[in-house]
Design a protein with these regions (language model features):
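Non-catalytic substrate-recognition and accessory regions of acyl/acetyltransferase enzymes
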Residues: 1-64, 69-118
Length: 118
């Protein structure tokens, strides 16, 4: 398990954007595996910064709302950030992201939410 919790990692990278690494496996009580990157990314016709990328994720209890809860926490704590979910393979998860309001990136199995506020 990763030693750094997700929120400490994101806070440090948003506060100091030039500090490396910008990506890391992080810890969270609901997740076995959670890889996070804080970066800039072109989304919806603009370069967005910050973007919180989520990849290589595995819930401890799949199907119990861990992802929905994580997104709600991230939106509350980082309303200025986009959330990007990278390389989503299961079609059921893709459909769930769309129901949650995510937009699918053209030609990719990746999805994003724009900031709560810009």
């Amino acid at each position: 398990m990763a030693d750094t919790d997700i929120f400490s990692f994101i806070d440090s990278r948003i506060a100091r954007p030039n500090v490396w690494p910008r990506n890391q496996h992080v810890s969270h009580p609901d997740w076995k595996t959670l890889y996070v990157r804080v970066t800039k990314r072109p989304l919806d016709g603009q370069i967005r910064d910050p973007v919180i990328d989520l990849a290589n994720i595995e819930a401890k209890r799949p199907g119990r709302g861990a992802f929905r809860a994580l997104v709600a926490e991230l939106r509350k704590m980082y309303p200025q950030a986009c959330i990007f979910v990278e390389s989503v393979q299961p079609e059921r998860f893709q459909q769930g992201l769309l129901r949650m309001g995510f937009t699918q990136r053209d030609g990719e199995p990746s999805f994003y939410l724009l900031p709560v506020r810009t």
